[in-house]
Amino acid sequence: MADTRPDFFTLENGDKATLPFAADEYAGRLARLRQMMSDRDMPAVLFTSMHNIAYYSGFLYCSFGRPYGCVVTQDRCTTISANIDAGQPWRRSFGDNVIFTDWKRDNYWRAVASVLGQPGRLGIEGDHMTLAAERTCREMLGIAVLEDIAPDVMTLRMIKSAAEIALITDGARVADIGGAAVKEAIRVGAREIDVAMAGRDAMELAIAEAHPEAEYRDTWVWFQSGINTDGAHNPVTGRKLRAGDLLSLNTFPLISGYYTAL
């Protein structure tokens, strides 16, 4: 009888989606990473942060209290995702995907182990993996050496490709659209939230037009007035604008996880 409560499984549901970048972009990133791994005699790397998983696989996760990962070896790139997301992580990943279930505690690590095997040495993100996760990693994977590769990987990410620069440049264009919409919405009596929504909606429409294959999330506007301008990160409120108010605006189009701001 088939196991109806597996620890992990694969689900290739639908067709692969169009990712933020072309296949050769991801292949180049992985090639540079694998060269670094080879130089450090490191058979495998486990990424856990949103930025590195997205950078190397194209998949931008939404954790909702669950861990996510991306295991890179010399011949595979595999995202590790929660059952609640079903086939979306596979569709949005450059490479393979393994899904872990919630039936038993630490099934995430069992899924990771199914891809890793026994590498002996594993690269991790020391600036992201918690101490508790590191202990569980050692116990469940039986890995003697965990090496922090976060600084090396950050150095690799800092050198932007032409494709990345094009995406960031378009983000700046979209930020300007949001700023113009905010300006048009400013009037005495308007609430901060009303003005912010005008800018956000304008940017999301612009992103959808320019990037029809993207996922749309995380684009927002900070718009503060009067006393609320005293802190850069004060949340948007329902305060109504008054004549003579100081105003502060920031528009943030996040296209496929790439940050730009006006």
Model-inferred region functions:
Residues 72, 182, 258-259:
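Short amphipathic alpha-helical leader/targeting segments
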